């Protein structure tokens, strides 16, 4: 699966799995930029995928097959992503004089075990050699990005796509796909200037602090749209099944009294403000943790993606709470997509940010 990174095709098929749906994106690569060939978001039945774990691989494969057939997608090679919460991502520094074979042996057979919260033999590990620098002792070091997942996670994804009649060529981490989607925007920041990528997903929020295109800090907070919907349903005394519909119509109040939880606020506003207030506190802790790792570190902007980023005025809410400019990701605009991309409603676009990044990766 890893060796295929170096073989390229002109089309990319990206498929993202989450507890609510399967997102499918097919892009055609042209010199003038990527063109959207197909895009679909197909709901998953309840109970097939929960808390980042696959419970019914055949059920998910059925949904994938139906989506491909409906949109007349013939491609068989696919790129997908494991959730950030299922991955271990570390930046490590090793002696720069190591050649490629020595570096590979040291990373995979010695260093990896030091950073894994589970046994090395239970892990699939990959790495990327980055640049070199001089450490405080005057020794030249090479920076290496180490990425690992449990083998059972990799096997779950391989099994699903095999059942769907597809060949999974690359399984990466969701935050890497989001970085790819935002590549052009990230290039506008100065060297050493970091941004926070926040993917408000279904079962949690993925936070990545990225500098020079490389994730420096990664964390998943167990607060996602599922929790928002449940809080709204409880506040309104309505069935949980109505939470998704309620969430789509929410606009976050921004006046100064809205954060106090006063009795003049309607129950839905109080519920969502409490959840978002807790989430912004967690994001602030993550940013502060990163800033405390060294001198002259800076986080300049926040990018919001995922299905939770469609809440009205959520960008302004986080701008106020964090004191940092905050932008909702529009992957169509970020990638300058041609084709039928304009037909995708704005309210659906942030949720496709990861899938678009997967489709952008050539295999």
Spans of model-derived segments:
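Non-catalytic, solvent-exposed interaction/assembly segments
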Residues: 1-111, 115, 155, 165-167
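Small-residue (GG/TT-enriched) beta-loop-alpha framework at ligand/catalytic clefts
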Residues: 13-37, 74, 80, 139-246, ...
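Phosphate/pyrophosphate-binding loops at sites that engage ATP/ADP/AMP, CoA/4′-phosphopantetheine
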Residues: 64-77, 164, 238, 286-301
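Active-site neighborhood for divalent-cation/phosphate handling
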Residues: 77, 81-186, 301, 331-337, ...
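Glycine-rich phosphate-binding/hydrolytic loop that grips phosphoryl groups
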Residues: 180, 309, 327-363
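Feature representing long, continuous alpha-helical segments
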Residues: 230, 270, 274-277, 281, ...
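Adenine-nucleotide phosphate-binding core of ATP-dependent small-molecule kinases
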Residues: 234-235, 245-299
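Glycine-rich phosphate-binding loops at beta-strand->alpha-helix junctions
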Residues: 275, 297-327
């Amino acid at each position: 699966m890893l060796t295929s990174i170096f073989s390229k095709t002109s089309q990319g098929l990206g498929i993202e799995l989450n507890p609510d749906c399967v997102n499918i994106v097919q892009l055609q690569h042209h010199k003038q930029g990527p063109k959207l060939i197909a895009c679909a978001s197909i709901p998953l039945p309840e109970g097939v995928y929960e808390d980042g774990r696959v419970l019914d691989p055949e059920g998910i494969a059925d949904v994938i097959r139906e989506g491909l057939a409906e949109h007349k997608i013939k491609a068989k090679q696919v790129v997908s992503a494991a959730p950030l919460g299922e991955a271990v991502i570390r930046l490590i520094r090793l002696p720069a004089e190591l050649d490629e074979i020595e570096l590979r042996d040291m990373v995979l057979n010695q260093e990896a075990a030091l950073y894994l919260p589970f046994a090395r033999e239970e892990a699939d590990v990959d790495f990327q050699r980055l640049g070199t620098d001089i450490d405080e002792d005057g020794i030249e070091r090479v920076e290496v990005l180490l990425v690992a997942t449990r083998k059972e996670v990799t096997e779950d994804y391989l099994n699903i796509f095999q059942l769907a009649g597809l060949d999974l060529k690359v399984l990466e981490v969701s935050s890497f796909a989001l970085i790819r989607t935002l590549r052009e925007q990230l290039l506008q920041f100065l060297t050493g200037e970091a941004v926070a990528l926040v993917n408000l997903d279904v079962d949690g929020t993925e936070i990545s602090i990225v500098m020079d295109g490389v994730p420096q800090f990664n964390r998943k907070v167990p607060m996602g749209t599922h929790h928002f919907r449940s809080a709204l349903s409880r506040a309104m005394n309505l069935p949980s099944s109505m939470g998704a519909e309620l969430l789509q119509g929410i606009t976050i109040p921004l006046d100064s009294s809205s954060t106090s939880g006063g009795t003049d606020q309607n129950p839905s506003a109080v519920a969502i403000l409490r959840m978002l207030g807790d989430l912004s506190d967690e994001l602030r802790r993550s940013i502060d943790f990163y800033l405390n790792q060294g001198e002259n570190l800076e986080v300049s902007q926040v990018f919001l993606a995922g299905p939770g980023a469609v809440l009205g005025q959520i960008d302004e809410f986080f701008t106020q709470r964090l004191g940092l400019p905050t932008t909702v990701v529009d992957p169509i605009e970020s990638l300058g997509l041609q084709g039928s991309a304009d037909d995708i409603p704005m309210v659906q676009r942030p949720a496709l940010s990861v899938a678009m990044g997967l489709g952008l990766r050539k295999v």
